[in-house]
């Protein structure tokens, strides 16, 4: 049986990347939350 996770970098960037997070209001909220938590890595 094929595994469910077949990694693709472009798909990852489109879904969870910085620019996709910046493009929506909810995404910007996520970024601000992660900044306030002090995360070194904000996005994928």
From Swiss-Prot:
PROSITE patterns: RIBOSOMAL_L34. Keywords: Ribonucleoprotein, Ribosomal protein. Residues 1-44 are annotated as: Disordered. GO terms for biological process: translation. GO terms for molecular function: structural constituent of ribosome. The keyword Ribosomal protein applies. InterPro entries: Ribosomal_bL34, Ribosomal_bL34_CS. Residues 1-19, 26-36 have a biased composition (Basic residues). GO terms for cellular component: ribonucleoprotein complex; ribosome. Belongs to the bacterial ribosomal protein bL34 family. PANTHER family: LARGE RIBOSOMAL SUBUNIT PROTEIN BL34M, MITOCHONDRIAL RIBOSOMAL PROTEIN 34 FAMILY MEMBER. This is Large ribosomal subunit protein bL34. It comes from Wolbachia pipientis subsp. Culex pipiens (strain wPip). The lineage of its organism: Bacteria, Pseudomonadati, Pseudomonadota, Alphaproteobacteria, Rickettsiales.
